[in-house]
Amino acid sequence: MGMACGVLAPAGRVVAADAKSLNIVFVNPGKTGEVYWDMVAQTMQAAGRKLDAHVEVLTSERNYRTMQELGFGVVARPDKPDFLILSNEESAAVPILEAAEAAGVKTLLLSNTLIGEDAARLGPPRQTLKTWLGDITTDLQTAGARMANALISAARAEKWQSPDGKIHILGIGGDEITPASIARNAGLQLAVAAAPDVVVDRMLFANWTQSEAEQVTANYLSWAARKEIRPAGIWAGNDPMALGALRAATAAGLMPGRNIQVVGLNWSEDALREIRAGRLLLTDGGHFLLGGWSIILLRDYADGCDFAATSPRVEAKTSAITRDNLAAVGDLIKTRAFDRIDFARFRARAGRCGQYDFSVDALISSLTLPEGTAD
């Protein structure tokens, strides 16, 4: 596994004056207006502006067939891009990777890599598919566990046990097939397996949406009331689902933050607002920055500092935002002023290719002051 926290160059590496301008295409698996994927694309384009790379974004509107058609269209272009960035959402990227291999287009997988039979058949990057350069993902299993442990700690501190002496939690996952979802859900199960006083009453799936999460939460809460179970916490695999859970809990007469806790993931502005209000315990994340980090990997690769010198698989850590550290990154997310990030600072140093520090602390230290702010 590649390093996402190596040695950070004090000033990074600027793009050489004679370096080739890069053309990069990103096939966005999300919907227009879907906060997480919009932010991934925006950080890509902000990094591209700093690193002499033009980033074209094509949006598949959460339809894997559209995603494949867009990918096939890119690799069939007479004027091919230098790099094509894909996400293996719904495990649908393999046909595009294979078409890119045949066309000689270099690819990078972001957020979701190959799993199961695909991984077994194709092996690691650069083996069967020579033009598949690698992947950049986040350690979402640890994120899922951290979210669950925060719920458990809060419930224990408040003594929110049910009459059976157990802490009862609802789990809401996005889906059962996307690698990033599987990892988050596994983190929840790991944390609960280590906590004999905790029970996950239900693991329900809400297709990543607020409306479906609101419905499944309402159903769970009415079931819990009938069974005389005291619900202590709701673990949601992304922020929209956490917001749906908040709405359902409030409608059921509960007071999130006071007699039940909810956690989410995505660092979305709506979630930060709920944290500030004391209704949401935390949002894990920062993984939308994979967009910017992916451009750094490809710029370094193009300039002869191949990240595969460490590993073709780069893994970045996520972090939780709570009321304690909200001020440090809240403004960046609210304004989406990603041009404040000095992406050149994160480039690998010569002789240390593939070693990156993509931590939240490094991010905070790289930020320039907002325009109009005095020194």
Question: Where do the language-model regions lie?
Answer:
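Hinge/cleft segment of the Venus flytrap/periplasmic-binding protein
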Residues: 20, 166-168, 172-173, 293-375
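Hydrophobic alpha-helical
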Residues: 84-107, 188, 201-273
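Flexible loop/hinge segments that line or gate small-molecule binding clefts
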Residues: 98-142, 165, 271
